[in-house]
């Protein structure tokens, strides 16, 4: 329960966001050059040792903005959700940077597509946050399909805000594709 979180807080280590925010001073943005590093993210190491990949500010920002408009057809003001691991380059880019650069609201979610508490977690999030664009991996929907093959949990939620579903990161198997086509 939420009250349990407060019981586990430790003085001197854990800070209350609202308290800290109320005493914070505004800070001006720091200008950077387009070629300055934005972040370093390490690859998985599937082809050997993990390698640090450095993204620059300008090029990455342009690519993210372009993809939001031309690939995802997102409009400023839309709600975009990438249900991915923020440590993966796609999750990092489409949770943190792309939606905000394009003027969208981004949804940050901690949990699995099933058993949090049930296979309706994705549908519940779409309804609650009026999500317009949803991006995840096929594995997530394979898990949902396994737990809820008849999409009974979907029927509990209004997902009419959803304009697009995008899947990437691995092969989308035909049974999962067909299941999604049939329920959506």
What are these regions (language model features)?
Residues 37, 43-46, 68, 80, ...:
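Conserved S/T- and glycine-rich ATP-binding loop of Class I adenylate-forming
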Residues 1-4, 61:
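Positively charged, low-complexity/disordered segments
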Residues 3-15, 76-77, 102, 110-184:
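Conserved adenylate-forming
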Residues 91-107:
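Conserved short alpha-helical elements in the N-terminal third of ANL/AMP-binding
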Residues 11-15, 21-42, 49, 59-64, ...:
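Conserved pre-ATP/AMP-binding loop-to-beta segment of ANL
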Residues 85:
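Residue(s) in the substrate-gating loop at a strand-loop-helix junction
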């Amino acid at each position: 329960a939420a009250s349990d979180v407060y019981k586990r807080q430790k003085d001197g280590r854990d800070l209350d966001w609202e308290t800290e925010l109320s005493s914070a001073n505004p800070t001006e943005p720091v200008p950077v050059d387009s070629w300055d590093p934005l972040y370093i993210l390490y690859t998985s190491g599937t082809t050997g040792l993990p390698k640090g990949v450095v993204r620059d500010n300008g090029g990455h920002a342009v690519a993210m903005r372009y993809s939001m408009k031309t690939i995802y057809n997102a409009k400023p003001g839309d709600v975009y959700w990438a249900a991915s691991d923020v440590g993966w380059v796609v999750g990092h880019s489409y949770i943190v940077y792309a939606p905000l650069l394009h003027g969208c609201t981004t949804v940050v979610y901690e949990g699995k597509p099933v058993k949090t508490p049930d296979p309706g977690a994705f549908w519940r999030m779409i309804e609650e946050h009026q999500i317009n664009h949803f991006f995840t991996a096929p594995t997530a929907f394979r898990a949902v399909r396994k737990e809820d093959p008849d999409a009974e949990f979907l029927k509990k939620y209004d997902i009419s805000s959803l304009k697009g579903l995008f899947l990437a990161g691995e092969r989308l198997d035909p049974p999962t594709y067909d299941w999604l086509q049939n329920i959506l």
